[in-house]
């Protein structure tokens, strides 16, 4: 779509939006460019219908008007963004056409942007300013993206909420009393609020998928090691730490934009595997929705899932079935979900041990001694993971390899698995100590950390998982679906999401 004169007039006047307003009138959002896709904006930039500086100024005006309420963009580099936009406009005028040239974006605070602070919400790191970019940020900049700033996260990126002592609390644009999710919560909130069209997040326990589900946007948890994890955090490693669970992934408001950003980010690190390997991802398995073989999972043996979430999932599966998709609700090759969850939880907890205070480890060791061997609860798996020996870690890793083989075997018969991203919709802010929190899931009191059960499937075995919005709860809160595919078949899950989006719709703006 072209940017007509009235649209240009809006952008020119964007700075006049009342910063002091609690929330601008809905009409302002509807009349703005803020909810266009990255693809549309890039076409407008390439054709000369809009300048990068105009897009940057419009985004800054919207952030300044709304973010005192939402608190998503907690590190700002507006002067740097304006300078980068001017440089991008000069390049566009010369005919340069990098894939993201002139597009304003934000990135999660944990990713290093040279000269900007990276604390991960930890007060002792609040003044730390890395001098080099995270490799993923370097790739975004090389593609021409203009970085406006960085978005909020929980302390250490270890929560399904986004608050910390350094930057405060990020609110969900759909309901300010609720969390946008975590750990990429500021990223999802920035997208939902219309600040930017692309974001960069990461995931080890649902950190891309939870916020996308809670805020009604799109995210893609990539296949393990698809995007190198080098240069992140206040104490970055000099070469990439080979992935065990955590991944980097794109976030957007459309499936096509996920594919666009992934094309920029994916590929081996030139310092390590890139010396000898190039990435060639397979194309999507199918071009038509009705050709996909779909397995739907709406129940987990270790944790309930809210009826509103399963209802939206089953509503989607019924629509797909009516279209002619081959829908299954069970499969003889489906790996044991309980074993998958317990193995994941132990390895996830083990990944945190090196960064825990010694007193916490001592408490966990004391608690582990009280566990019965028969206690196979999810909470017990956490304690065992936090006190795991190296020998037991190897045993759990062997179990993971066996589960990975079974999941990959399943994808010989199935193209995608659909399941909830999380057991609930966005919940009210809860800043009490994390290990004492609980969730109310349709009247059932559930330990807070159990909510990672659905997210853990794809993380444990390194599979791609795309999350997209598919409906609303009775309270009007977004509900998403998680689309899991075979290893390195990232294009298939994104393509399936794009087909669903085309057929049934996708992102809708919150009532700001």
Protein language model features and the residues they cover:
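Short glycine/serine-rich loop segments
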Residues: 132-265, 459-480
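Glycine-rich, small-residue loops and helix-cap segments
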Residues: 48, 102, 142, 146, ...
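N-terminal secretory signal peptides and thylakoid transit peptides that target proteins
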Residues: 1-17
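Residue-level signal for inorganic ion chemistry
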Residues: 59, 81, 258, 294, ...
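Gly/Ser-rich catalytic/binding loops embedded in alpha/beta enzyme cores
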Residues: 29-205, 318, 323, 405, ...
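Acyltransferase
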Residues: 54-57, 86-89, 307-332, 356-368, ...
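Short helix-loop capping/hinge segments that flank enzyme active sites or metal/cofactor-binding pockets
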Residues: 95, 100-120, 286-298, 328, ...
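A short helix-breaking turn/cap at a secondary-structure junction
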Residues: 27-31, 221-317, 362, 495, ...
């Amino acid at each position: 779509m072209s940017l007509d004169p009235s649209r240009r007039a809006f952008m020119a006047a964007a700075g006049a939006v009342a910063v002091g307003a609690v929330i601008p009138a809905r009409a302002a959002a509807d009349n703005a460019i803020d909810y266009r896709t990255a693809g549309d904006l890039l076409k407008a930039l390439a054709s000369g219908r809009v300048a990068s500086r105009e897009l940057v100024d419009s985004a800054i005006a919207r952030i300044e008007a709304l973010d005192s309420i939402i608190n998503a963009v907690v590190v700002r580099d507006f002067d740097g963004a304006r300078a980068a936009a001017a440089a991008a406009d000069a390049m566009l005028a010369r005919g340069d056409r990098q894939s993201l040239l002139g597009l304003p974006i934000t990135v999660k605070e944990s990713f290093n942007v040279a000269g900007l602070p990276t604390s991960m919400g930890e007060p002792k790191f609040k003044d730390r300013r890395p001098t080099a970019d995270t490799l993923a940020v370097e790739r975004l900049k090389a593609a021409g993206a203009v970085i406006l700033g960085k978005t909020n996260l929980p302390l250490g990126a270890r929560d399904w909420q986004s608050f910390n002592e350094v930057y405060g609390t990020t609110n969900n644009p759909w309901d300010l009393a609720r969390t946008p999710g975590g750990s990429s919560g500021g990223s999802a909130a920035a997208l939902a609020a219309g600040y930017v069209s692309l974001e960069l997040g990461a995931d080890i326990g649902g950190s891309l998928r939870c916020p996308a589900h809670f805020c009604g946007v799109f995210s893609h948890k990539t296949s393990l090691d698809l995007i190198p994890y080098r240069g992140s955090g206040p104490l970055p490693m000099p070469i990439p730490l080979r992935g065990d669970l955590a991944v980097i992934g794109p976030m957007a408001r459309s499936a096509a934009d996920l594919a666009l950003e992934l094309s920029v980010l994916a590929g081996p690190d030139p310092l390590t595997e890139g010396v000898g390997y190039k990435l060639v991802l397979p194309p999507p398995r199918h071009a038509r929705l009705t050709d996909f073989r779909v397995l739907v999972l709406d129940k987990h043996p270790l944790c309930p899932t809210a009826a509103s979430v399963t209802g939206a999932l089953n509503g989607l599966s019924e629509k797909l079935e009516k279209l002619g998709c081959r829908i299954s609700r069970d499969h003889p090759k489906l790996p044991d979900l309980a074993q998958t969850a317990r193995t994941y939880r132990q390895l996830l907890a083990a990944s945190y041990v090196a960064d825990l205070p010694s007193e916490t480890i001592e408490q966990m060791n004391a608690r582990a001694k009280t566990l019965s061997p028969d206690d196979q609860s999810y909470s017990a798996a956490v304690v065992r993971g936090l006190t795991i020996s190296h020998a037991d870690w190897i045993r759990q890793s062997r179990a993971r390899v066996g589960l990975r083989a079974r999941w990959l075997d399943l994808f010989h018969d199935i193209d995608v698995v659909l399941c909830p991203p999380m057991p609930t919709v966005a919940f009210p802010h809860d800043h009490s100590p994390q290990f004492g929190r609980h969730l109310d899931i349709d009247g059932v009191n559930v330990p807070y950390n159990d909510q990672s059960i659905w997210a853990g499937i794809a993380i444990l075995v390194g599979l791609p998982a795309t999350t997209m919005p598919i409906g609303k709860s009775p309270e009007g809160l977004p509900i998403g679906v998680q689309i899991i595919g075979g290893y390195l078949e990232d294009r298939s899950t994104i393509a399936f999401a794009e087909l669903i989006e085309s057929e049934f719709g996708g992102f809708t703006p919150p009532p700001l």
